[in-house]
Amino acid sequence: MTGRERREQLISIGRAVFAELGFEGTSVEEIAARAGVSKPVVYEHFGGKEGLYAVVVDREMLALEKVITDSLETGSWRERIEQAVMAILTYVEEETDGFLILVRDAKPGDERSFSTLLNSAVGQVSYILREAFEHRGIDPDLADIYGQALVGMVSTTAQWWLDERNPDREVVATHIVNLCWNGLSGMEVKPKLGGK
């Protein structure tokens, strides 16, 4: 096995172990044993558990960021919402280990975390909403509030669905999109609390 192949093997095994045991529960010894190598091989490639974890998190961040960005690039407003919701739920379903690592095992002080990824998504969604708000006569400066709400709703539901997996992805996506779209389409230009 070449050095590059060994590195990729360790990343793959590390990803699975971090998802299964969490950062704190994972040891270099466990990763090495599952890879069929000695601990010094892991240290040689990554300097330790922290180095391997950083590579795994960075790859997952880039993958999920691309999924979100790609889903928001084209289409009508509704299509973008549908594409983004389906993309995130598909990632949760197909890349469960990666999603688990991002949402359940974030280390304090990490520069790149699920929280920073969500902030980036909020920026993208808010930008799209600003354009839509201008067309509807709604103050575009309020787009950030709605961007936070929409991304938070999708993110929280995706985390819930990670454990539940019922109903299936399409049903969950349909209901998220229904709430997002119909909530946005029925927006009042100057909303008030309590029906005032």
Write out the residue ranges for each language-model feature.
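Hydrophobic alpha-helical connector segments
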Residues: 55, 69-94, 147-150, 173
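Helix-turn-helix
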Residues: 9, 13, 17-51, 55
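Amphipathic alpha-helical segments used for helix-helix packing
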Residues: 91-112, 126-130, 159-163
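Short coil/turn segments at alpha/beta junctions that flank glycine-rich nucleotide-binding fingerprints
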Residues: 20-24, 95, 136
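N-terminal intrinsically disordered/low-complexity leader segments
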Residues: 1-5, 140, 188-196
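Alpha-helical DNA-contacting segments of helix-turn-helix folds
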Residues: 30, 51-60, 102, 117, ...
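Amphipathic alpha-helical packing segments from all-alpha helical-bundle domains
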Residues: 62-65, 110-134, 144-149, 171-175, ...
